[in-house]
């Protein structure tokens, strides 16, 4: 009798994806973040579902409903903080996952990489809309400022903004539709994740050396299931430490008062994971230019396969490229810091220099470094 795991149509898919999947024997813990992102998504969907049962998407009661969840609903406080800090864990894993892809040349698998970039945009859109829902001052003014950026689009901009707002300002209509989209997008993300995995399993995983590993593969289970479980345990532990000891560490205290359209906070800033993009946006004095730079700061990832000039796939044996990569990481950390600072000297000029360096590194310095390394190979 054939093994049901290998013959049943449904179990066969699971078996080929998670159990008998051939995986390179040399992949390090940097390859854990895909499964961690899957766990983050599951946590977000589950906690979000239970929060949605008690949340009301009306401007008069939204803030009160969040307070009610934290005070009156059984374990509502832990649901709310798991969801808020789960988003932070999601982005930490996302940034590390993308960074791993850049370092080890995973972008050579174009389809997987491009679906990944679309996923990044979708997660960022979801997180932005979720931040609007508690209806505190940062929620309200963040929604106003970011949606208002679309008015920079020539000809259709103003109409587009009013269409998104559902009126002439951020109001009831905006909150209701943001809640609807915030609920819908995670399921679209789940579908995209399956497409991402579909393309990945067409080629198989990359490995730290960047050399094809077809001759040295091991089954995913038990080796990498155990490894992923260890990573999951570490991440869940970190998340619970954050939620139970300092749940407001990454949030903004300004958001603990109800939104007031008549009173603008002194410093409008997004959650920490958007600060690097916000700094790039602010560093350009022109509205349309800022919006373009903001979009391109993420969209530039799609160009990575075209900008790959090296004869080697991974950066493992390319010390000069490693220097450029870590310079890029340092630059992104600088941008994150600048995004949270007020718009005044010296932060303005630091932000502008860091923004220029960001684009310069990806578009010019890293490809040139790779070409130099190709010539050094001949010595």
From Swiss-Prot:
Binding locations of a ubiquinone: 201
InterPro entries assigned: Cyt_b/b6_C, Cyt_b/b6_C_sf, Cyt_b/b6_N, Cytb/b6-like_sf, Cytochrome_b, Cytochrome_b_C_euk/bac, Cytochrome_b_N_euk/bac, Di-haem_cyt_TM
Binding site for heme b b566: 97, 196
GO CC terms: mitochondrial inner membrane; respiratory chain complex III
Family annotation (Gene3D superfamilies): Cytochrome Bc1 Complex, Chain C (1.20.810.10)
Biological processes per GO annotation: mitochondrial electron transport, ubiquinol to cytochrome c
Protein keywords: Electron transport, Heme, Iron, Membrane, Metal-binding, Mitochondrion, Mitochondrion inner membrane, Respiratory chain, Transmembrane, Transmembrane helix, Transport, Ubiquinone
Cofactor info, note text: Binds 2 heme b groups non-covalently.
Segments crossing the lipid bilayer: 33-53, 77-98, 113-133, 178-198, 226-246, 288-308, 320-340, 347-367
Molecular function in Gene Ontology: metal ion binding; ubiquinol-cytochrome-c reductase activity
Localization of this protein: Mitochondrion inner membrane
Domain of life, per lineage: Eukaryota
Binding site for heme b b562: 83, 182
Pfam family, one: Cytochrome_B
Cofactor(s) named in the record: heme b
Topology relative to the membrane: Multi-pass membrane protein
More about this protein: Heme 1 (or BL or b562) is low-potential and absorbs at about 562 nm, and heme 2 (or BH or b566) is high-potential and absorbs at about 566 nm.
Quaternary structure and interacting proteins, as annotated: The cytochrome bc1 complex contains 11 subunits: 3 respiratory subunits (MT-CYB, CYC1 and UQCRFS1), 2 core proteins (UQCRC1 and UQCRC2) and 6 low-molecular weight proteins (UQCRH/QCR6, UQCRB/QCR7, UQCRQ/QCR8, UQCR10/QCR9, UQCR11/QCR10 and a cleavage product of UQCRFS1). This cytochrome bc1 complex then forms a dimer.
UniProt record similarity statement: Belongs to the cytochrome b family.
Protein role: Component of the ubiquinol-cytochrome c reductase complex (complex III or cytochrome b-c1 complex) that is part of the mitochondrial respiratory chain. The b-c1 complex mediates electron transfer from ubiquinol to cytochrome c. Contributes to the generation of a proton gradient across the mitochondrial membrane that is then used for ATP synthesis.
Protein name as annotated: Cytochrome b
Record organism: Pteropus pumilus (Little golden-mantled flying fox)
Chain's gene name: MT-CYB
